[in-house]
Design a protein with these regions (language model features):
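Charged, low-complexity surface segments at secondary-structure and domain boundaries
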Residues: 1-6, 91-92, 132-140
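Sequence/fold signature of self-assembling virion shell proteins
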Residues: 2-56, 73-81, 87, 98, ...
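Generic structural signal of hydrophobic/aromatic residues within well-ordered alpha-helices
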Residues: 15-23, 119, 123-127, 153, ...
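Long, contiguous amphipathic alpha-helices that act as assembly "spine/axial" helices in icosahedral shell
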Residues: 49-51, 73-135, 145, 158-173, ...
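Residue-level detector of alpha-helical recognition elements and their boundaries
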Residues: 64, 125-126, 130, 220, ...
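Active-site-surrounding "flap" and adjacent substrate/cofactor-binding loops of secreted or lumenal enzymes
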Residues: 65-66, 71-74
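Extended, solvent-exposed, turn-rich assembly/linker loops in the middle of proteins
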Residues: 131-200
């Protein structure tokens, strides 16, 4: 196919679903997306969520009837405060197949190695910052110590009547491997043994690279083309583990449609120009902070 016949709009539409699929597959927090079903507004950066407030039962009086009580429901507007993006250039190619291979490799790796880790890190830091359960930071260096700390986290959520079903335990790689050492395994008939931990006490267990697992991160503005992404906030600690119930959090990620410009429209280089942009944010509901528990490392 001649270069002049490659349609930029069609190319963008072709790759958009692929980018979305990579995000869903690679993100450790994607499982929490959209569980609260917010209602979108015309403004792409605003979503509405329904918040309720109510009191418990009162005595029924045969003379006066039902006890009055405040039960209210309101729509609250939440603004997505993170507006991130990046432009890519791919040298001019003579045919669509070669262009597609180059672009797919470039953007696929960008989503996997840059976008997904940043989204996960931002969400974990947000949830850690809002967690009601937050014991004194400590190093967990033994398998028994890890189990004791996780038991305390579960007990804390139990005491707040947080539902047991559906809880998710996110653990740093150090904690995850200590946890593996605390549990015994049995050889199966074919002589293999699977030591991976996917569930513990009814909770899904997800291992998180420490590079995504902090109680605070700084987003780099990227004004310098050689810099971007995020880093651990000075004074904020690494996380050992984070236990939460998905109903306590809301996270939104809006991947704006890709913009693609052919070389003859690119004013800076003889190259295809691709622009990627995403609005996103994460929230913990004010009345559900008890459903989030974080254990921090000492540094």
């Amino acid at each position: 196919m001649a270069l002049t016949t490659i349609n930029g709009i069609e190319l963008a539409e072709k790759f958009q679903p692929i980018l979305d699929e990579i995000y869903k597959k690679e993100s450790l927090t994607a499982r929490l997306d959209g569980l609260s079903k917010p209602v979108d507004h015309n403004d792409a950066r605003t979503v509405y969520v329904y918040k309720t407030s109510m009191v418990g039962l009162g005595d029924y009086d045969r003379a006066t009837g039902f006890a009055a009580g405040n039960v209210t429901g309101v729509w609250e507007a939440l603004e997505l405060t993170k507006d991130r993006g990046r432009a890519f250039s791919v040298d001019a190619m003579s045919d669509e197949e070669t262009l597609g291979m180059a672009f797919g490799t470039l953007v696929g790796e960008f989503i996997r190695t840059k976008v997904v880790p940043e989204l996960d890190a931002y969400r974990f830091a947000t949830y850690a910052g809002k967690a009601s359960g937050k014991p004194t930071a400590a190093a967990l260096t033994t398998s028994s110590g890890v189990l004791t700390a996780i038991d305390l986290a579960q007990k804390t959520l139990d005491g707040k009547e947080v539902p047991r079903e559906g809880r998710v335990l996110y653990a740093s790689e150090d904690i995850y491997y200590l946890l593996k050492g605390a549990l015994t395994r049995t050889w199966v008939s074919d002589g293999t043994v699977d030591r991976n931990i996917e569930r513990l006490d009814g909770m899904d267990v997800v291992m998180v690279p420490q590079t995504r697992f902090y109680e605070g991160i700084d987003l780099i503005n990227g004004s310098d083309p050689s810099t971007g992404g995020y880093g651990q906030t000075s004074g904020k600690k690494k996380l050992n583990f984070l236990l939460l119930h998905p109903s306590a959090v809301l996270q939104i990620a809006k991947h704006n449609p890709l913009r693609v410009f052919a070389p003859d429209l690119n004013q800076t280089a003889d190259a295809w120009l691709f622009q990627y942009r995403i609005y996103h944010d994460a929230f913990v509901y004010d009345n559900k902070t008890d459903s989030v528990y974080v254990h921090r490392y000492t540094s």
